[in-house]
Amino acid sequence: MPLLGFFFNFTFLIYISRMELKRVVVTGLGAVTPLGNTPEETWQNMLAGKSGAAPITHFDTTQFKTKFACEVKDLNINDYIDRKEARKLDRYTQLAMISAIQGVKDANFDLEKVDKNRVGVIYGVGIGGIKTFEDEVSYYAQHPENGPKFNPFFIPKMIADIASGQISMLYGFHGPNYTTTSACASSTNALASAFNQIRLGKADIIVSGGAEAAICACGVGGFNAMHALSTRNDDPEHASRPFSASRDGFVMGEGAGCLILEELEHAKARGAK
């Protein structure tokens, strides 16, 4: 079996080496971050040296060692997603969809003319719908007498790959669609995968990026138990210092980012910026 695997890998490498690989360009951006709810706002606040770290507002941190994080602020979900639909989505999926909506709008390709069979979605996420998991399990633990009554959207809201699926369904994209989950490298791996899909000629456009929303009791409590989070509660803005001898852990954040990756000739043919 190892020899057979080597043979297939070797054959694939020869095949790739003889292919004319496509060039890939970025034609659209989307971002929802603790520094801003658009790419422009995020960039300007970054240039101004602002920090997104502040006391946590998502839940009561009285009993937690870490009481601050980088939350997305002042975001009206319903500016992008219908209120009824938003209730069916975990926060991480909401953020992912908003970043994708911004990216698709920025790329400005004609949704009526583009070949949707060659437009894909590949997103990365480290954890997924942890807040949904927390809410459902907490309710069952607090009310066992009611029996196992779970929301029918529990699993669809929680699973890690739902964001890429929701984005595809929103636009009717039928190209490559999957999620990469590799902890802090998830989004980088998603972009690398999207890049390769286009390079190999399997898609013309990939909506790619990453999202996470784990600022909840389970998320913060779990990382606190690992002694992984900073507890510099008196100075949140300067707590993230990975290269300092006085570092004491990372600072949790939430948000989403999107790059519209596109095959060069396809982008030029439609007059992309």
Feature map (PLM): residue ranges:
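Short, positively charged and aromatic/hydrophobic N-terminal segments
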Residues: 9-16
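ACP-dependent fatty acid/polyketide chain-elongation machinery
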Residues: 17-85, 107, 265-273
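A glycine- and small-residue-enriched flexible loop/hinge segment at structural boundaries
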Residues: 58-109, 113, 160-174
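Acyl-thioester C-C bond-transforming condensing/cleaving domain
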Residues: 20-21, 37, 48-56, 105-115, ...
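A broad detector of short, well-ordered amphipathic alpha-helices
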Residues: 40, 94-101, 188, 192
